[in-house]
């Protein structure tokens, strides 16, 4: 088996780094929305995981039933978080496979 040229390996590594950085920028520039209760509660989450807005339909605001609202908020947050994880996997996953092409060094 022929060893790959070190300059080739470095060039490939630099390309991978640039692609990873671009994917990270795309993720950070994205906002995902998680909803619960058929849209009664929604949470917008930025690519860095910070919540940027929460929308609550007045129909679910009931002082006698705070638990339902809490459950809806948790559900909307969980959905937004899951969407963000899926986005990161879609953007970064294919790039991690590129390490196989670096001469088997990784």
From Swiss-Prot:
The keyword tRNA processing does not apply. One of its GO terms (cellular component) is bacterial nucleoid. It comes from the Bacteria. InterPro entries: YbaB-like_sf (IPR036894), YbaB/EbfC (IPR004401). It is found in: Cytoplasm, Nucleoid. Keywords: Cytoplasm, DNA-binding. Gene3D superfamilies: Nucleoid-associated protein YbaB-like domain (3.30.1310.10). The keyword Glycoprotein does not apply. GO terms for molecular function: DNA binding. Homodimer. Binds to DNA and alters its conformation. May be involved in regulation of gene expression, nucleoid organization and DNA protection. Belongs to the YbaB/EbfC family. This is Nucleoid-associated protein DIP0260.
